[in-house]
From Swiss-Prot:
Assembly: The 20S proteasome core is composed of 14 alpha and 14 beta subunits that assemble into four stacked heptameric rings, resulting in a barrel-shaped structure. The two inner rings, each composed of seven catalytic beta subunits, are sandwiched by two outer rings, each composed of seven alpha subunits. The catalytic chamber with the active sites is on the inside of the barrel. Has a gated structure, the ends of the cylinder being occluded by the N-termini of the alpha-subunits. Is capped by the proteasome-associated ATPase, ARC.
Residues excised as propeptide: 1-53
Keyword Protease: yes
Inhibition and activation profile: The formation of the proteasomal ATPase ARC-20S proteasome complex, likely via the docking of the C-termini of ARC into the intersubunit pockets in the alpha-rings, may trigger opening of the gate for substrate entry. Interconversion between the open-gate and close-gate conformations leads to a dynamic regulation of the 20S proteasome proteolysis activity.
One Gene Ontology biological process: proteasomal protein catabolic process
GO molecular function, one term: threonine-type endopeptidase activity
Record keywords, A-Z: Autocatalytic cleavage, Cytoplasm, Hydrolase, Protease, Proteasome, Threonine protease, Zymogen
Catalytic site positions: 54
Main location: cytoplasm
Cell compartments where the protein resides: Cytoplasm
Organism: Salinispora tropica (strain ATCC BAA-916 / DSM 44818 / JCM 13857 / NBRC 105044 / CNB-440)
Enzyme Commission code(s) on record: 3.4.25.1
The encoding gene: prcB2
The name this protein goes by in its record: Proteasome subunit beta 2
Pfam families membership: Proteasome
Length: 279
């Protein structure tokens, strides 16, 4: 239950007392019902009743990391949305993408962004990249009850590590399971229903020391391959001009490719596959 406010208009002690730098920990005391996974759910499975986001890929580069996601959300055998955005900046130097229950994933992403901003404002410094991954892991763990009823959210987190001694290894990738376990991945990773096909494509084409531009094209190709075999993953939609969301994190910060830039890459990939469908 949310903290009761004083009729005089003063904030409750909870809002003014010295506490944790974690916004989600504060929210768990002030209004726990607002946290994902804390709401009571009826018995049964809800897998086919809500839109689900699908495939996200991450690739480490010589100067950072690239994160990309397709735009399709499905509900059972239906396409629920064709232009959903699953990849977002977590803060100035990190990115997060969500696969799974779309509504919970969007809520979890926003909460994670606030969590990192709240920490930076209260502590006067940014969390380390490992610290960010651990905070996200705790949030995913908090959704375990809903995950057991078919409303799982599986994030993919990537960022530029400002504390890295070797700039060539500053791009780091973390995957998670539904219980909140964080796992650092080497080189590349993918999550979602098309991840098996995306990772197969990445496995064949990935090499150490990729430039950001090469990694961006590789990410789009991996999503194309995933869409080719997985009905829940959307490929480049040339008719509606809907293309993957592609972002990078480097020493200069996070950057999202413009619609025109992504369109040019996607159309080039599609043209190449018309000549060689297998890539």
């Amino acid at each position: 239950m949310a903290a009761a406010f004083d009729p005089s208009g003063r904030f409750p002690d909870l809002f003014t007392s010295v506490g944790t730098s974690s916004f989600s920990a504060f929210l768990s005391k002030a209004a726990p019902e607002l946290l994902p996974g804390r709401r009571p759910l009826p018995p049964g499975m809800a897998t086919g009743l809500t839109p689900h986001a699908t495939t996200i890929v991450a690739i480490a580069t010589a100067g950072g990391v690239v994160l990309a996601g397709d735009r399709r959300a499905t509900m059972g055998n239906l396409i629920a949305q064709r232009d959903v955005e699953k990849v977002h900046p977590a803060d100035a130097y990190s990115l997060v993408g969500m696969a799974g229950a779309a509504g919970i994933g969007i809520e979890l992403t926003r909460l994670f962004q606030v969590e990192l901003e709240h920490y930076e404002k209260t502590e006067g410094a940014m969390l380390s990249l490992d610290g960010k991954a651990n905070r996200l892991a705790a949030m995913v763990r908090g959704n375990l009850g809903a995950a057991m009823q078919g409303l799982a959210v599986v994030p993919l987190f990537a960022g530029f590590d400002l504390a890295a001694t070797d700039p060539a290894k500053a791009g780091r990738i973390f995957s998670f399971d539904v219980t909140g376990g964080p796992y650092e991945e080497t080189g590349y990773d993918a999550v979602g229903s098309g991840s098996v096909f995306a990772k197969s494509a990445l496995k064949k084409r990935f090499r150490l020391g990729l430039s950001v531009d090469d990694a961006v094209r590789l990410a789009v190709e991996a999503l194309y391959d995933a869409a080719d075999d997985d009905t829940a993953t959307g490929g480049p939609d040339l008719t509606r001009r809907i293309y993957p969301v592609v972002m990078s994190a480097t020493a200069e910060g996070t950057h999202r490719l413009t619609e025109a830039e992504t369109a040019a890459i996607a159309e080039s990939v599609v043209a190449g596959r018309m000549e060689n469908p297998g890539g």
